């Protein structure tokens, strides 16, 4: 493909006419979906290096929270705070698509800080148990910047199946 062809493909959804769902209704639907799941794919990267990690998450205070022992995702996190999360259902045909891509900013929470301990409590993990781990468990916090939502069911109500939320 030429550069222009890549650009045209990349801009496909930007240039497509959209029938937007009212923002509050969209946010409510998205929150319900996020809350009904607990696993995402976390994409991190820097330079030529890219990593996509399946990981459990919690969502509260408008952010995604993930405990992690470590792993190669931290190669990207060290140098690049920009991340992407994907939450999705099993593919069962184009009429049943349900997924969210979340672009956001990641930060590592200081172990045993008030924020860290608060999240441990929400996850029902005793802080004393976490203190016994060496090294301590890492806590990744992702603040959403943009969510791209693809729910086929939106079409039934006259909206485009693809919706965007900017933060």
Features from the language model and the residues they span:
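Short Pro/Gly-enriched beta-strand edge/turn motifs at strand-loop
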Residues: 35-41, 121-124
């Amino acid at each position: 493909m030429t550069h222009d062809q890549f650009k045209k493909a990349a801009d496909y959804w930007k240039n497509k006419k959209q029938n937007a769902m009212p923002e509050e209704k969209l946010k409510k639907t998205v929150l319900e979906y996020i809350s009904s799941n607990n696993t995402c794919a976390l994409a991190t990267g820097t330079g030529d290096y890219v990593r996509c990690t399946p990981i459990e998450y919690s969502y509260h205070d408008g952010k995604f929270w993930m405990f992690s022992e470590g792993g190669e995702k931290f190669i990207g996190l060290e140098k690049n705070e920009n991340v992407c999360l994907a939450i999705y259902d099993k593919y069962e045909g184009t009429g049943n698509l349900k997924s969210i891509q979340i672009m956001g900013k990641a930060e590592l929470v200081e172990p045993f800080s008030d924020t860290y301990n608060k999240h441990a409590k929400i996850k029902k993990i005793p802080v004393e148990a976490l203190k016994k781990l060496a090294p301590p468990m890492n806590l990744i916090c992702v603040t959403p910047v943009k969510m791209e939502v693809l729910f086929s069911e939106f079409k039934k109500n006259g909206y485009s199946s693809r919706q965007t939320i900017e933060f």
